[in-house]
From Swiss-Prot:
The gene is cas1. Homodimer, forms a heterotetramer with a Cas2 homodimer. Keywords: Antiviral defense, DNA-binding, Endonuclease, Hydrolase, Magnesium, Manganese, Metal-binding, Nuclease. This is CRISPR-associated endonuclease Cas1. HAMAP family: Cas1 (MF_01470). GO terms for molecular function: DNA binding; DNA endonuclease activity; metal ion binding. It comes from Pyrococcus horikoshii (strain ATCC 700860 / DSM 12428 / JCM 9974 / NBRC 100139 / OT-3).
């Protein structure tokens, strides 16, 4: 049985009866095949009994919580079973050493830039985002790298806008709250991708709170933010572009709230379905020689980072060939 993500939009309670997980809601009690659950995404008001939580933890399943507006709140992160003290020391060493940290931070931005450029090419838009890479390579501080990355992304959104339907223009990237429909869609997808990457990191020996481009924080899994630089263009942005170009999302799938614009529940369901389908799309990997899914590419990227940290092979970010 291939494991799949479980997404809950309804209000209710997750319970356990013997060796079965149930979701109880106003619609009744529904059994959930826990062996088929990869991770859980909760958008509704959901209570979880301690028995259910223990069972979910035993199975090594992460639960990602999002608030009513679709913003990421946090993750239930079961006790890690793949911990490596040596790797954690190597991760910390690469953060504390300025040159090693700069190398990784620049690598994440380089990968993201080339993937954004690939998107624009696929969409028939001319742009030379890689012209910024010389300036990126000259950066000597993390803040300088972040500034270059911000300008690259600003130009990327401006170019992307040229190819978007009139009612779905980005205009300017806005967050918390997004000021228009396209910003709401991008924010929702980025939050979902952030959580997906957390799940993939959990299934490796990496510590999720030690990062290089983004400052480590007590309140976030910042390594997921680093890796998301590479995957936002080739997963989240491609889903967003396809949904609005094909007319799968319409104005009616958004609502005004919090002085901004947010997806309706129906809109979130449409986006989630498209996102999950995107994760399962496969492509032949040039190095491995076999087909791998988009989701597997995230795990492989984490493994590449591990090889770099332990000195086996220098890290090179994923640059999309598809």
């Amino acid at each position: 049985m291939r494991k799949k993500p479980l997404t809950i939009f309804s209000d209710g309670t997750l319970t356990r009866r013997e060796n079965t997980l149930y979701f109880e809601s106003a619609k009744g009690r529904k059994p959930l095949a826990i062996e088929g659950i990869y991770d859980i995404y909760i958008y509704g008001h959901v209570n979880i009994t301690s028995q259910a939580l223990h069972y979910i933890a035993q199975k090594g399943i992460l639960i990602h919580f999002f608030n009513h507006y679709g913003y990421y709140d946090g993750t239930f992160y079961p006790r890690e079973t793949l911990l490596s003290g040596d790797l954690i020391i190597r991760q910390a060493e690469h953060y504390l050493n300025k040159e090693k940290r700069l190398f990784l931070a620049k690598s994440f931005v380089t990968g993201g830039t080339k993937n954004m450029e690939r998107n624009l090419k696929n969409w028939g838009i001319k742009a030379k985002l890689s012209d910024y890479l010389d300036e990126l390579n000259d950066a000597r501080k993390i803040t300088e790298i972040m500034n270059v990355e911000a300008r690259i992304r600003q130009e990327y959104y401006a170019k992307w806008d040229e190819n978007l339907p009139e009612e779905f223009k980005i205009v300017k990237r806005t967050r918390r709250p997004p000021k228009n429909e396209m910003n709401a869609l991008i924010s929702f997808l980025n939050s979902r991708l952030y959580a997906t990457i957390i799940t993939e990191i959990y299934n490796t020996q990496l510590a999720p709170t030690i990062s290089y481009l983004h400052e480590p924080s007590e309140r976030r899994f910042s390594l997921s933010l680093d890796l998301s630089e590479i995957f936002k263009p080739i997963i989240a942005d491609r889903v967003a572009n396809r949904l609005v170009k094909k007319g799968s999302l319409k104005k009616e799938h958004f609502r005004e709230d919090l002085n901004g614009v947010l997806l309706t529940e129906e809109g979130m369901k449409i986006v989630t379905k498209a996102y999950n389908e995107e994760l399962q799309k496969s492509v032949k990997h040039p190095k491995i020689g076999s087909n791998v899914t988009r989701q597997r590419l995230i795990r492989l990227e984490a493994y590449k980072l591990i090889k770099h940290l332990v000195g086996v092979e220098e890290y090179k970010p994923l640059v999309a060939w598809f």
